[in-house]
A protein has these predicted regions:
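Short beta-strand scaffold positions
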Residues: 4, 36, 68, 111-112
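Conserved glycosyltransferase catalytic-site signature
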Residues: 6, 38, 95-97
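A general structural signal for well-ordered alpha-helical segments in protein cores
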Residues: 21, 41, 54-57, 74-78, ...
Length: 131
């Protein structure tokens, strides 16, 4: 199981040549379980101006696994954020903490291209896939 960070989805949808796009394509072709949460979908859809584009994304995500939002996930994300702040690490987005918490609770690997996940993985049991 893999949870895919928004930055990877954006590269995938825009046709970027980043290694994560290739990796996501492989996972989709292999029919691996791709997880997402509502925040990831929101971040992707917020940047799409055309209604048809939003409908296309919604349709694509219907074939993926939605992880329902739980209070425990929110509390873990807040703990991650606060603990790393105490250690002097600047996490740029609380959303990354929420994605990491979702991955920890589901046992999924995070496919990303964002340094925040590597900081988190140094202190919490989140598995990341990197180049």
């Amino acid at each position: 199981m893999t949870i895919v960070d928004t930055s990877v989805w954006i590269d995938f949808l825009q046709g970027s040549d980043h290694w994560t796009k290739t990796r996501l394509k492989e996972k989709l072709n292999d029919r691996e379980s791709i997880l997402y949460n509502d925040i990831i979908l929101l971040e992707i859809i917020q940047g799409i101006r055309e209604r048809s584009g939003r409908e296309e994304i919604n349709s694509m995500f219907n074939s993926l696994v939605l992880v329902p939002h739980k209070r425990s996930t929110t509390l873990l994300a807040a703990e991650i954020y606060q603990e790393l702040q105490r250690k002097g690490l600047r996490i740029r987005s609380i959303v990354d903490c929420l994605i990491a918490a979702t991955a920890i609770e589901t046992g999924a690997t995070v496919l990303h291209k964002d340094r925040d996940f590597e900081f988190i993985a140094n202190y919490y049991p989140v598995i990341t896939e990197k180049e």
